[in-house]
């Protein structure tokens, strides 16, 4: 991580392959997003690291430097806490990943060459917090994206914390410790199924007990991490791979049964039917070690 501070503002040096407009195109796709606000190409968000609650504005200069400005007197005094915030931002935008091999592969790939050219500099936007990533995966199961965002907003505003600034509330995702103490009845006002409520509370309790953690999963290889996630009630292969991709940063994560992925392939290949799983496996052979990026770019084609 290369960064420094100027007058209490954090300045992060960006990798060569980075385009803020491409990333904002992804981040602004849903008006119901409750975890950040974007105005004039500036992201305002609360970054929570343990008990740290920092309200920051993130902007970019010439795709070379990322500027992180603290609002509302929320700049941590201790340098190690500011380092954790920089680390969070690196994970959020996947800044430590050299995308050169991905683009070398994509420019020769019949399916990826168009999205790789059109969305050059797009990163797989992450969800660094494991509980948030798992909840988002569960909330999105078998419903459309707009309704999933609505459920997330209800959940966050019912059980999360917030920082108020300039008359607006900026939200922190509910901590697993808080959700672990609830019952499905407590979530009844949120228009999710009882099953989803049970799944989310169950995940929170596994994390509260220490049985499940990001640190433990990160020490595993891909297959073991996938198996450990799938054995959790409410987590199937799709959700597991979504979390492996967006939180744990396994490059081979591949939600092969994803509806959006299937639809994107159908569009780009001008098919009059859905591609089969075997066809997708064959198409994806050149994507080895970059399946997560290939998936993310194919999703991006859809909006």
Swiss-Prot record:
Outcome of gene disruption:
Disruption of this gene sensitizes cells to the alkylating agent N-propyl-N'-nitro-N-nitrosoguanidine.
Active site, UniProt feature: 258
Query: Which CDD domains would you find in this protein's record?
Result: ENDO3c
- Entry's Gene Ontology cellular component terms: cytoplasm; protein-DNA complex
Tell me which UniProt keywords the record has, alphabetically.
DNA damage, DNA repair, Hydrolase
Entry superkingdom:
Bacteria
Q: What is its EC number?
A: 3.2.2.21
Please, one GO biological process term? base-excision repair, AP site formation
GO MF annotation terms: alkylated DNA binding; DNA-3-methyladenine glycosylase activity; DNA-7-methylguanine glycosylase activity; oxidized purine nucleobase lesion DNA N-glycosylase activity
Name the site position(s) for Determinant for substrate specificity and/or activity: 238
What this protein catalyses is: Hydrolysis of alkylated DNA, releasing 3-methyladenine, 3-methylguanine, 7-methylguanine and 7-methyladenine
Q: What induces it?
A: Up-regulated by methylated AdaA in response to the exposure to alkylating agents.
Top-level EC class: hydrolase
Spell out the note in the miscellaneous section.
Overproduction of this gene renders cells highly resistant to the alkylating agent N-propyl-N'-nitro-N-nitrosoguanidine.
Similarity section:
Belongs to the alkylbase DNA glycosidase AlkA family.
Q: What does this protein do?
A: Is involved in the adaptive response to alkylation damage in DNA caused by alkylating agents. Catalyzes the hydrolysis of the deoxyribose N-glycosidic bond to excise 3-methyladenine and 7-methylguanine from the damaged DNA polymer formed by alkylation lesions.
What's this protein's name? Answer: DNA-3-methyladenine glycosylase
Native organism = Bacillus subtilis (strain 168)
